[in-house]
Amino acid sequence: MEHHNSHLLPGGSEKMYYIAHQQPMLRNEDDNYQEGYFIRPDPASLIYNTTALPADDEGSNYGYGSTTTLSGLQFETYNITVMMNFSCDDYDLLSEDMWSSAYFKIIVYMLYIPIFIFALIGNGTVCYIVYSTPRMRTVTNYFIASLAIGDILMSFFCVPSSFISLFILNYWPFGLALCHFVNYSQAVSVLVSAYTLVAISIDRYIAIMWPLKPRITKRYATFIIAGVWFIALATALPIPIVSGLDIPMSPWHTKCEKYICREMWPSRTQEYYYTLSLFALQFVVPLGVLIFTYARITIRVWAKRPPGEAETNRDQRMARSKRKMVKMMLTVVIVFTCCWLPFNILQLLLNDEEFAHWDPLPYVWFAFHWLAMSHCCYNPIIYCYMNARFRSGFVQLMHRMPGLRRWCCLRSVGDRMNATSGTGPALPLNRMNTSTTYISARRKPRATSLRANPLSCGETSPLR
């Protein structure tokens, strides 16, 4: 049985993509040609790379009836010839399409499984550090913990279900309840991230522009976080209402009764305006606020003091601390924008029928989908790299784990031996006090060694 990746359209052979919301490339099937009809839905959102559909006539092995009618879609009918002699069991072995090959599935596993693992571990560690360390319980860190919870929601529910159903199985195996929840949680997670970044920028803006004003208290910050989640849940509420299971216009899905999870809007107009509104609420408005606040903050923090104005060491330390925090949050904002903005712009462009027939579209959609899903594992890396307290919390947590503690101890012992023998980087030399007093002579050596090396192999200092 030979498989082709083309469609027979009126006036010649042309490749075409079916469009259906929230779905990726599907399988190609053209076998044993016979007269039928080609049904093309009006484009809605994402790609079906599939072939023509048969009519419900006597010569068909099966036909589309009312079971594959999609509400709100307009159909055009063409005469075509369709091949359909295949079975559900041997399809994977016979398909030569790139999206169904074993090599592509291996690539998908290698790209998405690390995101799932690193995002859960990293964001879980961020939450643990914030809530278990008293000095880390600041207003900004509460907002950062809210960001981490949103990323955990995305990584635990959306990442595995999306790549398994879209790229591995090509159908939805998780049931109707998870179909509603996964689509809902993805929108909620993005909205929470956007609104929390806005809350952080406003908190930083007030603290830097009006330093004498009362700061936002921790209690007030918890109310803001609850409000952010409530607004995100309310804004994304239409998505689980219109989500459901459906058999797409693909011969393989129809014959094998394989369902997909998608949004089924009553009309394309409603879908378009909601998608446009969601794009504005997720990106346009938050980015406008973030650009304004961080531009003013940058001018104030990096501006030089007027000549003749005194600047103490304390002022310099506070200015450096503010610059570090602003740099870290700016990095978080830039990474969020670079990861999610291309995918959401693509969602809007898919409403254009001419763009939906663009040949490289499946590859662009796959790349942008991976980029958007990968965002949930980047923030912990940024915190660890750009914030000394988070970095210290990560190190102390590693010392509490037996396997990692042994590795860290062996590494630190090796560094000390290399420094002693001169083969490695030398440890910093501390000035030794040669004068001995009565109090220093009575001091216990063990206490001195613990102060000098609080993270020794035998002891683990508590997170404070």
From Swiss-Prot:
Glycans are attached at residues 49, 79, 85, 183. One of its GO terms (cellular component) is membrane. One of its GO terms (biological process) is neuropeptide signaling pathway. Its main location: membrane. InterPro entries: GPCR_Rhodpsn, GPCR_Rhodpsn_7TM, NPY_rcpt. Keywords: Cell membrane, G-protein coupled receptor, Glycoprotein, Membrane, Receptor, Transducer, Transmembrane, Transmembrane helix. It comes from the Eukaryota. It holds the Pfam family 7tm_1. This is RYamide receptor. It comes from Drosophila melanogaster (Fruit fly). The gene is RYa-R.
